[in-house]
A protein has these predicted regions:
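Beta-strand-rich interaction surfaces with strong enrichment in secreted/lumenal proteins
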Residues: 1, 112-116, 126-131
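Polysaccharide-binding surfaces and accessory modules of carbohydrate-active proteins
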Residues: 1-108, 155-184
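Residue-level preference for beta-strand/loop junctions
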Residues: 7, 121-123, 135
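Short Pro-Gly-centered flexible turn/kink motifs
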Residues: 23, 129-147
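Short beta-strand and strand-turn-strand segments in soluble, beta-rich domains
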Residues: 40-46, 115-125
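Glycine-centered flexibility motif
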Residues: 95, 99, 113, 119-120, ...
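Substrate-binding groove/exosite segments of carbohydrate-active enzymes
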Residues: 118-121, 181-193
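Short, Lys/Arg- and Gly-enriched loop/turn segments at beta-strand edges
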Residues: 145-155
């Protein structure tokens, strides 16, 4: 995305059903919002917590420590689509003795909706999608910095500016959107799509 007036990055996920039958997909999007810096901060985890941003379809990590010189000690992960379930606690998403390669939320088929306090913040948004034949739904994701004391307000502004139809981002995306190709197993053969 070209330089914008806000500290954000936008990703687009488009899934296409090229088959003849309707499909159901369970999609998990994850952004680890650690808020770590080069500066050694004593008690980093003590000041860190993750919250749900219900109106903005996302999760935020907030770090409210003593005498913080930088108001942008908050990070957000938003979606243009309402998630089916969500999680703000990376450890709850992974599960005990598990890793990101085999998280418990994937085995359960949904997130628990937990907040995070003194645990790593993993902004996880889960979507149950139904794709009709030929359908290709698009979901935009935004990762950005926000003022720690105005997280909800800034998340709402980011949604208006970048994730809603007709937003600033739509014009930029129309000019620069590219398509990644992946290999798909179809009728026993790998095909590039």
């Amino acid at each position: 995305m070209p330089a914008a007036p806000h500290p954000v990055e936008i990703w687009t996920l488009t899934l296409c059903n090229l088959g003849r039958r309707p499909r159901r997909l369970s999609v998990f999007a994850l952004a680890e919002l650690s808020l770590l810096t080069d500066v050694s901060l004593y008690g980093h985890a003590s000041y860190l917590h993750g919250i749900k941003l219900a109106r903005s379809h996302g999760v935020a990590a907030r770090k409210v420590g003593m005498n913080l010189p930088n108001p942008y000690y908050s990070a957000i992960f938003l979606s243009s689509r309402r998630p089916t379930s969500w999680e703000a606690n990376l450890n709850a998403f992974k599960g005990q003795f598990r890793t990101l390669a085999n998280p418990i939320a994937l085995a359960r088929g949904r997130c628990c909706g937990g907040i995070s306090s003194r645990d790593p913040v993993g902004a996880v948004l889960h979507f149950q999608l139904r794709l009709a034949p030929g359908a290709s739904p698009r979901t935009d994701f935004l990762v950005g910095a926000a003022d720690v004391f105005k997280v909800e307000a800034e998340a709402s502004r980011y949604v208006r500016n970048y994730l809603q139809s007709g937003s600033l981002a739509d014009d930029h995306f129309a000019r620069m959107r590219g398509t990644d190709e992946v290999d798909v197993l179809r009728r026993g053969r790998w095909e590039r799509q």
